[in-house]
Swiss-Prot record:
The modification Hydroxyproline is found at P6. This is AnmTX Sco 9a-1. Has analgesic and anti-inflammatory activity in vivo. At a dose of 0.1 and 1 mg/kg, exhibits anti-inflammatory activity by reducing the volume of edema during 24 h better than the nonsteroidal anti-inflammatory drug, Diclofenac, at dose of 1 mg/kg in a mouse model of acute local lambda-carrageenan-induced inflammation. At a dose of 1 mg/kg, reduces the content of tumor necrosis factor-alpha (TNF-alpha). Demonstrates a significant analgesic effect on acute pain sensitivity in the carrageenan-induced thermal hyperalgesia model at doses of 0.1 and 1 mg/kg. It comes from Stomphia coccinea. Disulfide bonds join C7-C18, C10-C25. Belongs to the sea anemone BBH family.
Length: 27
């Protein structure tokens, strides 16, 4: 299995992918 790099900063993990979390970094 391919390991996903840890999601940090404004990113959250969803399943096996990282996505930009607007709740962590509101504009």
């Amino acid at each position: 299995n391919v390991l996903v790099p840890p999601c940090s900063g404004c990113y959250s993990q969803s399943g096996n992918t990282c996505y930009y979390d607007v709740y962590k970094c509101p504009s």
